[in-house]
Amino acid sequence: MRRNTQDENMRKWFKVTIPYGIKYDKAWLMNSIQSNCSVPFTPVDFHYIRNRACFFVQVASAASALKDVSYKIYDDENQKICIFVSHFTAPYSVKNKLKPGQMEMLKLTMNKRYNVSQQALDLQNLRFDPDLMGRDIDIILNRRNCMAATLKITERNFPELLSLNLCNNKLYQLDGLSDITEKAPKVKTLNLSKNKLESAWELGKVKGLKLEELWLEGNPLCSTFSDQSAYVSAIRDCFPKLLRLDGRELSAPVIVDIDSSETMKPCKENFTGSETLKHLVLQFLQQSNLCKYFKDSRNIKILKDPYLQRKLLKHTKCPRNVDSLSALPETQHDFTSILVDMWYQTVNTCFLPRAGPESQRWWCLLSLKWKDGLRVLILPSCGPSSLPLAAIPVCAS
């Protein structure tokens, strides 16, 4: 009878899936769902599967309320967040929960590895700890139940933890470690060296930590970057306040702290210089690029958002497609919205005879250093240039 009750409880679980949930910060996502859900719930085993965020709940009323939350939350891009709820068996961390005796042994082992003076916990190569192996206890931190048990003990026994060493544990993903932001939020040093992490994307799962020191050497992800600067830049995207990476001091991060209550003053249009140059630049802007078309591009290399990919597809017959093309923006700039910072210019005026001395004319050679390269304009002139550089007469044979 008791076993039947346990089996029934194992079946009373619901899986909650948020498509493209990987785009959102875990804390923001869960707080948004909790605040919009009419029934309080406790998420269990939060993790990511490809680009989806998933967790489990056991209460049927909470599952029903979560269905009602779907499409009621908007992200920063004003896109609705979809939530799917389905019946499921108990999550892995619940079905394979450590027994009380195993939890007690794990706690004793972690106590031995804790440095009180430095508030540091050394869990490197934990699976092969002699005390655990002597009692046939397998603590494999890649398994969510083992990582969940470890974080639970950490929260209860080491609330002031500052340094955590997870070196050499064959970690290939950090789903189980994502709860560290709630269980041990004060951690400043994290050692993940000599593991199996293949992508810096995994670090996004623990980016809620305010890390000052991080170790990643010995992971496959370290060889995926073209150079050291690209490596440092990618890691700092997750941890902006990082000071040391793999034991090396990093330059102090540049952090611009602007009070959100202050409104930045608008840029005032100003032009000083030759009116001739102003006219030439204006002509250049009228004909130079087609930036307005970029937002409607269907180039997969440019457009990554799946929502926009679906939104921009046109499932119509030929006449409708023509209508779609006619709806594209015209190739015309809004000149009132354009500000040009001309920081480099060279002007040469040269003498180029055509048929003979009677047809000698002056030409103005204008070189503009633009953002994507050097642009050269050659224009007829009635005489030597009045622009800053002296005229250079050149005779063609």
Curated annotation (Swiss-Prot):
Compartments, as annotated in UniProt: Cytoplasm; Nucleus
Alphabetical GO biological process terms: mRNA export from nucleus; poly(A)+ mRNA export from nucleus; RNA transport
Limits of the RRM domain: 13-92
GO cellular component, one term: nucleus
Domain NTF2: 280-367
SS bonds (residue pairs): none
Annotated LRR repeat ranges: 160-185, 186-209, 210-237, 238-265
Pfam family, one: LRR_NXF1-5
Keywords linked to the UniProt accession: Cytoplasm, Leucine-rich repeat, mRNA transport, Nucleus, Repeat, RNA-binding, Transport
Record: disease: A chromosomal aberration involving NXF5 has been observed in one patient with a syndromic form of intellectual disability and short stature. Pericentric inversion inv(X)(p21.1;q22) that interrupts NXF5.
Subunit structure: Interacts with NXT1 and NXT2.
Protein purpose: Could be involved in the export of mRNA from the nucleus to the cytoplasm. Could also have a role in polarized cytoplasmic transport and localization of mRNA in neurons.
Identification of the protein by name: Nuclear RNA export factor 5
Organism field: Homo sapiens (Human)
Organism lineage string: Eukaryota, Metazoa, Chordata, Craniata, Vertebrata
